[in-house]
Amino acid sequence: MQWRGAGLWWPRRRQQQQQQQPPPPAFGPPAAAMVPPSRGVSPGLGGRPTSALLFLCYLNFVPSLGRQTSLTTSVLPRTEQSTTYADFIYFTAFEGSVRNVSEVSVEYLCSQPCVVHLEAVVSSEFRSSIPVYKKRWRNEKHLHTSRTQTVHVKFPSIMVYRDDYLIRHPISVSTVILRAWITHWHSGGGLNVRGEENLLHAVAKNYTLLQTVPPFERPFKDHQVCLEWNMDYLWSLWANRIPQCPLESDAVALLSFPYASSGENTGIVKKLQNFQNRELEATRSQRVDYPMVTISLWLYLLHYCEASLCGILYFVDSNEMYGTPSVFLTEDGSLHIQMHLVKGEDLAVKTKFTIPLKEWCRLDISFNGGQIVVTASIGWDLKSYHNQTISFHEDFYYNDTAGYFIIGGSRYVAGIEGFFGPVKYYRLRSLHPAQVLNPFLEKELAEQIKLYYERCTEVQDIISSYAATVQVGGERRETCDFHNSYLDLKRKYGRAEVCRGLPWEKELRDRHPSLFQSLLQMDLLTVPWNQNDSVLEIGARIFEKAVKRLSGVDGLHQISSAIPFLMDSSCCGYHKASYYLTVFYETGLNGPRDQLQGMLYSLVGGQGSERLSSMNLGYKHYQGVDSYPLDWELSYAYYSNIATKTPLDQHTLQGDQAYVETIRLKDDEILKVQTKEDGDVFMWLKHEATRGNAAAQQRLAQMLFWGQQGVAKNPEAAIEWYAKGALETEDPALIYDYAIVLFKGQGVKKNRRLALELMKKAASKGLHQAVNGLGWYYHKFRKNYAKAAKYWLKAEEMGNPDASYNLGVLYLDGIFPGVPGRNLTLAGEYFHKAAQGGHIEGTLWCSLYYITGNLETFPRDPEKAVVWAKHVAEKNGYLGHVIRKGLNAYLEGLWHEALLYYVLAAETGIEVSQTNLAHICEERPDLAGRYLGVNCVWRYYNFSVFQIDAPSFAYLKMGDLYYYGHQNQSQDLELSVQMYAQAALDGDSQGFFNLAALIEEGAVIPHHILEFLEIDPSLHSSNTSILQELYERCWSLSNEESLSPCSLAWLYLHLRLLWGAVLHSALIYFLGTFLLSVVIAWMVLYLQYISASGSSPAPAWVSADPTSSTPSPAVPPAADASDHDPPMMANGPEPRG
């Protein structure tokens, strides 16, 4: 096999387990002259000892800074020096550094016919002794005479020029050796002899070093070509840029925080990319058939594998096959290590040792070609537990970028039951365990996990012994009572029986007082006999007792007394209690916050596959909050586990489940229609359904089947209404629903014949769900894929998402009629179409494609994979049940219970519960402040705005909190603007109004926010222009028919602008002058009037005779007026003071 790559690479022979074949060595001066005998031969030059010694001599003879040297040595014995001493060779490089053409002067003397050799050898970081120039010539005539010849040594362009549009990858060389030697023609040094053998016959030799030039200090080459203008322009943009290699290492942290593996078919998916560093990437590519990697991971196993294999860490290639390396756990606790061979087969080996249970163990597995070294170390001091070396004579195929790694389970294999600690992966190095750097950073949390299971082992032993003792005693008493009447008389009249004391010391009883109290108060005779089932059943009873205490009127007061019982329930494997403890510790609900204990119980619940615990872990890693690291792949592992259970849970008739509905406590209209079995809405629907109203029958059946709108889940009653509606009405939806129930036998005996008739009847009425149902029938029961595809294509054209998903399944399984083989691309397209229509399984397939990135149409996007899996997981009925209990408590005014259940739901990361909890805390700040150890309003509104589907009012709330500041949170106008802008972008008029109000107060809206709102800052450069745009958008989005605050603000702004325009125009000066003139004239006339009134007590035209009230009609008015000095002012303006 050979190294793969371009350039001056040497062929590499396959390295077997015990034998290594090095690349050909370089050559140098004689070993006898320079190398001490004690050093021996270098291990890397074992292929040709003589040539290796010569190369070492050359290396030892290289001066550290010298450019030229003239040294002549002889390889013949000293007794023969007189015959060969005349032979010599010198040369001078006129330019001490590497150039495209370097002129070299060679001076030599031959005593016999000879051949003169000149050679240039270069070395780089990864390759050495590569000849790049060779020249030789004969000298037969000019003997015993010094000769000088000038040689123009031409080096490759990639060594002497910078990279440009033609020289894409110049080589950075570390050493350039120019060497020359003379061989006699008749002594085995002819032209037909290869260079390596020629050097052995050299009678004189010499060398010099040429100084190398770094790639970015080299000149550009004139290629004598004319570039197109676009190429020339692009070249000018980056011609003088010096790229910098990113800091890159082959060590990859696949996992840094503990992962709770539930032993199911979900795990962490990690995909490695090519190295950006060209040298690292070249090394990785060359080792495709010779892996040198190291895996280091921490494990805490609870149980060995129940199946034949359980996934630990394995590689899945692009063909969905296991690759190299793949590590599994077996049912007896040993390791199963599997490799894929170059020839296409697979090879596996099983370790001779087993992994210990309930101990933190570090596994270090190193691959060095065909050799595998497995080391298991126990505890934090890495006390060696076992070491095993396995050797193969096969070539392993290794390409860590042509697929993805999985930690834990997948759809191919279940994962281990336990916990993963940090996982480190060295891509290019085979390391000894002492060289591996993989510390457990969360050591305190790991210690708590170990202590928890030690305590739980003790609790389970107590419960098992106690239950067994009580049950055996009860069974014996029942048996004796049935068969022996004499004992009846003895118990009645004899001495009372005394129970035998249970074998527990006082110290043990003191450590578990709540457990013994629960056991004494519990009727254990009804507990199942099986040990695991009995422990779980007792845990469930302890939990119900604790929850009953928490559900009282003052339930939050009882949290501290309920915690010991919840701990006992958690130890019994009933992990609903674990989630309660998680929330209590992480939120400080009526107690101090303890993040470490919160993480502990969250991980324990996740390991037990508890739905709400897994969603809590997924959410915390998705957002990176509460000291959980941001890790989308880890978040996906938790969310996908619950998402895959959600469709199964929805079709499970038993269990505390309810439909997840988006009901906001601030929406009074929605709250009014919430009902119960004795509520007005339900009773009215039942009345209408009894009268034969098909719509009422369907709605009533849906409410009872799924547990919607406050009605408890009751599948049996729902099926009765489905049957009544299907058989009595012609409504196609009811007919279809009842047909599905009959097909699946959900709460009723299966009746495939009647179901098919009803399905055909509904399809004939044009119901696309029924058309899809017919396709499902022919696919599942008849295996008639052609007919199934026909119905599904028809239903898909009608817009049915189920049909899109089913068509995708046909392509995925490779059974689509007329299409040979599988077509994953088309399957992915149909799954994506189904997911966009709300299909749960289609969404799950899309999330899987996004996390693996194995389909070209689904580029790897871990964040999008988490979003899609989270969307499905939040439809889980067990979460819906908790939300419904909180809503019912709120409607009934039970504040303690409402707060408890909404905190439990909000910590899973579902947005509607987060905003509802914040609303409760706003309504009852006294309750939140007293019992919650977190800033409730701030925490949950802040959580909600980081959701994908966050409501606009949450952005407005956070904007207000940033604007005013809230409790310990400081004011932040910049973030306030961002929140208001996001609300405005979501179409909320209040967001535009608040932004305008900030501008009115003097705040400045950054340009990127304006561009975010699609407001061009160049067109709206002034605050006035921006205000106009904001108020206009606010008015256009307002839902009020009458005048709204937005319209009034817009009108007021324009009035101000109009008034400002008037004040700044020329007309104002004219009007001002005119009014001033009028006022002055009036003042003068008024003063004249006052002075005239003071000299004459009555006007001249007024008669002194009181009987005369008017002037004489004989006097004309004009003449009458002219006879008096003061003018008549009866019609003048009234004075205004």
UniProtKB/Swiss-Prot annotation:
Give the region (Disordered) as residue ranges.
Answer: 1-42, 1100-1137
Q: Does the keyword Membrane apply?
A: yes
Phosphoserine modification sites are S613
> Any idea which UniProt keywords this protein has?
Glycoprotein, Membrane, Phosphoprotein, Repeat, Transmembrane, Transmembrane helix
**Transmembrane segments annotated in the record for this chain:** 1067-1087
Domain of life, per lineage: Eukaryota
As for subcellular location, the record says: Membrane
Q: Where are the Sel1-like repeats?
A: 575-609, 611-647, 694-730, 732-767, 768-800, 801-839, 840-877, 952-988
Give me the Gene Ontology terms describing cellular component.
Answer: membrane
* Entry membrane topology: Single-pass membrane protein
InterPro entries tied to this protein: Sel-1L3 (IPR042756), Sel1-like (IPR006597), TPR-like_helical_dom_sf (IPR011990)
Keyword Glycoprotein annotated: yes
| Glycosylation (residues) | N206, N387, N942
What PANTHER family does its record include?
A: PROTEIN SEL-1 HOMOLOG 3
**Protein name in the entry:** Protein sel-1 homolog 3
